[in-house]
């Protein structure tokens, strides 16, 4: 069978780009290495263009081990946009924080490669390889500020708990293989349709939920998030909050809506309970936080709960809702964390009280932070409102209690988001000196703000693309 390399141009381009960035970093003089950030950015933009051009290019490789469909391409585009915005927002922060910038940028690229492999994984081996490439790369990024104890502590916590979750996930995959006799996700679906469920299969599914629950920071597998988010470099935190979740939800949908769709009634309640706990605990624990990165960490736990609502239905509408909301979530989250990086770079603090009078010191940053926080709260007419509408609509008939809980928790989130807004807009600044934003960070802020507003007012094109991607789901 002839191998069609055209189907993996995104993966090949990312591998070459990551390798080239690293090798060039070793060859060029240290004073010239800052330009490698621009090189990585241009390369990622090129890869994004290639991926968009190949939107209609679909196929199956390696007898079903690698699936290239519009569903996978959608998540690849999402992960690439995340990487581009993170790199763009990293220039000033990374130049100040670390010396070997080329290692940072090449690791971001290889992290993205792991994510896109996960999006196309059609079997357990490919899934695990992509997951581990992403996880190991994130370990390097989280501990990148090795001269700071907090960053090293975050890296140590992440590698230990990530290793544990990977072990649980791998054991769950082995149990599913033992129950079905295949590692191909499509074949798993057919085996379940023919033979039904077994206790061994159910245990395997539960372990998969636990392993992937760590990656998306779902309760009760969320305990690592606040410490790691706080200790990691802020651009890495934003990438961890959006890229890791996007790739993990791509896998979750493949496995549960595709592979385990035949036993949906046996795992729906489990996922619904985890979604409810994530919304509840994430929002409630965010209220007393005084560190903005920890507050956003708990907020991201709640956001994972909202996205899991779409997984509960596991229908085409649910898949569309997950994809739509994940896309919106990228812009709001990266926009907020970019502001955090800008303020931290100037004040060396992540405390909410140090955002006092930000509207006077950095008007654009304060405005973008407000818009992103309101979007995450689901305030119309911003994008987050539309995304939550699509998600909650999928469970109205069978799980109305999730809709009520989601609406209540969204109102709770308004409290702690507006608390930050009041500090920025009402309180007087401790210092009058303006905060320098920088050209690259300004571009990131403008992109995230404009996308959050436009996708809320005019969501039709994105909804149509998400619908096309959901319909292309190859696992029948």
Swiss-Prot record:
It comes from the Bacteria. NDH-1 shuttles electrons from NADH, via FMN and iron-sulfur (Fe-S) centers, to quinones in the respiratory chain. The immediate electron acceptor for the enzyme in this species is believed to be a menaquinone. Couples the redox reaction to proton translocation (for every two electrons transferred, four hydrogen ions are translocated across the cytoplasmic membrane), and thus conserves the redox energy in a proton gradient. The gene is nuoN. This is NADH-quinone oxidoreductase subunit N. GO terms for cellular component: plasma membrane. Keywords: Cell membrane, Membrane, NAD, Quinone, Translocase, Transmembrane, Transmembrane helix, Transport. InterPro entries: NADH-Q_OxRdtase_suN/2, ND/Mrp_TM. HAMAP family: NDH1_NuoN_1 (MF_00445). Its main location: membrane. The chain crosses the membrane at residues 8-28, 35-55, 71-91, 102-122, 124-144, 159-179, 201-221, 239-259, 267-287, 295-315, 322-342, 366-386, 405-425, 437-457. The keyword Electron transport does not apply. Belongs to the complex I subunit 2 family. GO terms for biological process: ATP synthesis coupled electron transport. GO terms for molecular function: NADH dehydrogenase (ubiquinone) activity; NADH:ubiquinone reductase (non-electrogenic) activity; quinone binding. It catalyses: a quinone + NADH + 5 H(+)(in) = a quinol + NAD(+) + 4 H(+)(out). It comes from Desulforamulus reducens (strain ATCC BAA-1160 / DSM 100696 / MI-1). Its EC number is 7.1.1.-. The keyword Oxidoreductase does not apply. Coiled coil: none annotated.
